[in-house]
Amino acid sequence: MIKPLINLTGGLAAALLVASTHAVPLKQEDLSVAEVLRDRALESSDAYSLVESLTVEVGPRRAGTKGDERAVAWAQEKMKSLGFDRVYTEQIDVMRWARGHAHAEVVAPFPQPLVVSSLGYGAATPEGGITAEIIEFDDVEALLKAPARKVKGKIAFINKRMERARTGEGYGPAVQGRSKGMRAAAEKGAAALLLRSVGTDSDRFAHTGMMSLDGVENPVPALALSAPDANLLEAMLKRGKPVEVKLNVHNERLADGPSFNVIGEVVGREKPEEVVLIGAHLDSWDEGTGALDDGAGVAIVMETARLIAELPQRPRRTLRVVLFGAEEIGLVGAKQYVEAHASDLDKIVMVSESDFGAGKIWRFDTRIPEGKFAIADQMMQLLAPLGIERGNNKSSGGPDSSVFVARGVPAMGLYQDGTDYFDYHHTPNDTLDKVKPENLRQNVAAWVVMSFLATEMEETFGRVPAEQ
């Protein structure tokens, strides 16, 4: 009990008193402490200071690069300074790649330059580049269905627009072209792939990102076009004349190398072996500074742990913050973490991740057994005043967290407003000025409520069905 922290007023105090008269899994004093933590978070700018530090002092940090090395060192130093009880790293193995110059231009019928970005781990063109005719497809499914004879030797252009949504639900359909397009183009004998950027903006920035490389024997160059340049190609093609594009791309695959998951713990006072795991990913793409993806998430979970570590006593269970490495190239850090700790996953009480930018949180989802909904209902008493509504019980907890959920670990998700997230996602425009300090404060307030109460609840969630 931490009664000196408790300062309740009016309606909330009454609500907590009513809750305490029923058989509920969270004690009134724990809810009271969570309220104080929430209100402290709303008054603090420390999360913004963290993301400012990361973007200014480290900057881009693609897995396996010098920036990644600096980020790992930065994270360890910050965790120690924030009062974590244990700070350590676990090595992971990552593919490495060097991005070189990428140039694209229309050479006929209307010569003009195009703004492009190589997709992650994309191949280079032959010396001197390639020039070929464009063939357009509405989506990757159309490319997959096309006869190889129509595609061979041409540059396949996937012209799929992404729909804007608060939930980001337009990303799934649109990203199929990025993940599957290069493989499809290579199998059809295309000279290269051009992809309308997977984004919702109309800025002249291209959106990079990872693509599937598995089983591709002869990869072809693959580049994202900015939305205005995709519109330009579309307009040229409508004029009924063949459109020829020249590409000159200099990328290089490097030998595999190490990266790291960075882990910090606030060790539990009663049940240190039981773990509430909250995370974000430390790596970013290399053309912006990764402020939204995922610098904000890194700051949110680190600040959450700092607030809990400053309490007069440690939480009942261990709070573990994992800053996953190499998320952007395929959830590598999370996958290797789960494999390395497979025998201990039953000790993880709950997992959650912040990896959707820095918008305000508007919804609280779970993936817990139905018999445990009372815990989430009690958490909602303190989340609702932040403008957060109760969602569904289908949460993955976040991209990295989904790897844990697939093994039966319960999850919770605090979902941010993603209306404009994909305007900046994976672009040079993902920079600190897009992060609003007031939104970060609201995020941390929600995270500290959820995380603290998960460490203090009387009972655990048990397991959820593992996914095959």
Please report, for each region that a protein language model flagged, where it lies by residue:
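Extracellular/luminal Protease-associated
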Residues: 65, 115-221, 289, 390
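His/Asp/Glu-rich mid-to-C-terminal helical/loop segments that flank catalytic regions of hydrolases
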Residues: 306, 310, 422-468
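N-terminal signal peptide c-region/cleavage motif recognized by signal peptidases
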Residues: 18-20
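Soluble metallo-hydrolase cores and metallopeptidase-like ectodomains found primarily
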Residues: 31-33, 108-110, 115-148, 211-291, ...
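Metal-dependent peptidase/peptidase-like ectodomains
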Residues: 111-113, 132, 220-225, 230-231, ...
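N-terminal capping segment at the start of a domain
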Residues: 25-65, 205-213, 283, 354-359, ...
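Short helix-loop-beta-strand segments that form the rim/entrance of peptidase-like active sites
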Residues: 49, 307-332
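Noncatalytic luminal/extracellular "stalk/propeptide" segments of secretory-pathway proteins
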Residues: 24-36, 52, 56-155, 160-167
